[in-house]
Amino acid sequence: MTQRSRKAKLFRLIGSMCIGGAVFFAGVIINRLWISNYFSDRAAEKAREELLTSWNRPTGTTVPFLSSASTIAPGEIGPINAPTNQEAFALLYIPRIGNEVWATPIFEGVQSKQLNSGIGHYPQSQIPGEEGNFSLFGHRNSHGQPFINIQDLQVDDEVIVETKNFWFVYSLKHDKIVRPSATWVTGLNRLPELELTEDDPFKVITLVTCEPRHSTDKRWVWWGVLQAVYPHSTPPPALVKPNN
């Protein structure tokens, strides 16, 4: 065997090893994503069923159709109990990205335990019905990835929060990409884009996730304002469809 043929054989061997290694690691990554999403989906389903059962509601993700729905004045909302640490206390619906966010459990806290089972609520922020900023964080890649398609959201899209006694309907108004250090996004900021007057109550929802999708370098943030509140007996129209 000549020296040239030995080198060619060596290069082919190295090339095969590189290709094999790349295929192996790609498989590991894909498998990891699939497995994490699978177990996160199961955990979210379990949390949702337990929450609905505690509310004495039928389990599942189907909202019953009613011929009409009536709103209630925010002043008619009674005191809402503060969520228990690390527990699910509400469900989130976003019709625009309903394949990913539909009856998704909202947990108190934004640690891995909560985010791997649904969407997390920043403990220092307010809760639905309170004056302030109801701030949420969700994964965009792996572990259920509820906000994987945040780029599809548009101004005036509805974001709906279901609690034991009420449905809170928010309308998205503004989005921004920021650094992870921009903690002001969950604060009490009357951004001009929210179109709030000084007399309007400050009842805002904030959605936060990673940007770009496969990185934690930045955060994509959406803000919305509370538009309506419905008693739980009459779901908002955006959630229901007539029976065929």
Model-found features: residue ranges?
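Juxtamembrane low-complexity tails/linkers enriched in Ser/Thr-Pro and polybasic
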Residues: M1-S5
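Solvent-exposed, non-transmembrane regions of membrane-associated and secreted proteins
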Residues: R6-N244
